Amino acid sequence: EAQYHNFSDLELIPVATGDEIDIGGRTLKFISAQMLHWPDSMFTFLAEDGILFSNDAFGQHVCQSKRFDSDYSVDYLLKEAQKYYANLVTLGSPMLRMKLQELTDNGILEQIKMIAPCHGQIWTNPGPVVEKYSEWASGVCKDKITVIYDTMHHSTEKLAYQIAEGIMSEGVEVEMYFMQEDGPDDAITDILDSKAIAIGAPTMMNKPFPRIGNMVYWLDCVNFKGTGSEKNALIFSSKGWGGGAVAKLQRDLEEAGFTVTDTMDVLFVPDEEVLAEAFEKGAALAR
């Protein structure tokens, strides 16, 4: 029931999945899409023209002077769609899988000629983004690992670079994020289709450095578990005495659905032997 006071004098017709409205030569068909990504989200299909008004699904956080996907690079738009999905839709992945199946079962999916989301470009060729949504919602990953780190006096940074080198030595793609320069939203975008992460932070007051603590908070919020993806994690850290960052990160990452396969907890500045160990741990994560 609508609670907002301005609705009180309006004539409202509630609609749900399966309802249709004839608007004069055109038929609107409704499909409830709760939590994609609002509780009241709904798809509306304009049957005669094959247009799916998808609300938030299939959107991108871009605002361009032109309206259609054909005006821009498909690779650019799919990357923006991935960023939107990773940060806003991942939590609703089980619902999205259900809705894609529902659109298939009722014959609407094969009739879609255009998708008009609330945000970003209109898809005149919806095939690529529908395919990507199916992959993202099902936890399909590339042979890719995302490395995320912060550093205080460059010790953790040295570990990060050696781990990345080890990963690449196995022919696996690496995306690297330094949290003093990069945002968590960009890192989460790449984590969506990564098979694993390596995450590092120096210890500060027996806890991870704050930006990495914030990063792990967001990983728990978006909930990659919902995609069915089983992502491994390598944790690395430097410390001055007692440590504590690794233990905290391990607890929080496991709660967020990651499988922690290995850790490094280094005292002060890593020497050549420790850096060689970091390289091997990166290679092992890639394998």
Which role does the model predict for each range below?
Residues Y149-T151, S237:
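Short beta-strand/turn micro-motifs composed of small residues
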Residues D56, Q64-F68, V74-I115, H119-I122, ...:
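FMN-binding flavodoxin-like domain, especially the glycine-rich phosphate-binding loop
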Residues G59, I122, H153:
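Short, glycine/acidic-enriched loop or turn micro-motifs at the edges of active sites
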Residues H5-D71:
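Catalytic core of the metallo-beta-lactamase
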Residues T156:
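Glycine-rich phosphate/diphosphate-binding loop of Rossmann-like nucleotide-binding domains
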